[in-house]
Amino acid sequence: DFSQGSIVGLACYAAAVVSSFSIPLAIVAAVGVGAGIGLLNGVMHAKFKIQSFIVTMCTMFIFRGLVVFFTSNFPAETPYAIYDYDNLVGKFIVVVAIVAAGFIVFRFTKLGRQVRAIGSGEIAAAYSGVNVDRTKILAFVIAGALAGIAAFFALVRTGSATAQTGNLMETNVMIALVLGGLSVSGGARSNYMAVIIGAMMLTCLTNGLVLIGADPITQQLI
């Protein structure tokens, strides 16, 4: 899903706009926008049979353009109280809960088995009784909703939504997968913990470069 970064950017802007009325509703707005874009991606891919990387690459540019347009012409003001939600313990609990829930779903539920089956072979999965289209759409919706949560985290950390919010996040996602040794083509042998390990390695590497004072160009090169 190459549109993850753009989803974060647009969901962050939506949350920023709604936060002036209600911060809890801003969370709902971020998750809702993310899930909605995920639904669009899933339907375009599953129902119209367009390759997922083509669909999500198109939506990546479309929604990034919307983020730039909205933030440039209609900047959103956020209340100072938004920083009260920038709580390390709270965010840690949310992340751990999401990771644990993802592990349980991926390893021990029917949905997880269906996802792995589709990754191994769509035709075989369909013959075994898996509703391929519905499962794919659901996967995109979940990914979009999680991007919405990330968008709210970005908002409470910076207090604003900018044109650069979530920019290049899709690249970081791919790097995390590769660092974790996960096959980007998926399949029955996919290891959920490899995703977590890859994300942690990328975070440690990025933060380490910042701590040693590496300039942005050097960081990007590495």
Task: Label every PLM stretch briefly.
Residues 48-111, 137-138, 157-166, 218:
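Transmembrane helix-bundle core of multi-pass membrane transporters
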Residues 161-221:
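Transmembrane alpha-helical segments in multi-pass inner-membrane proteins
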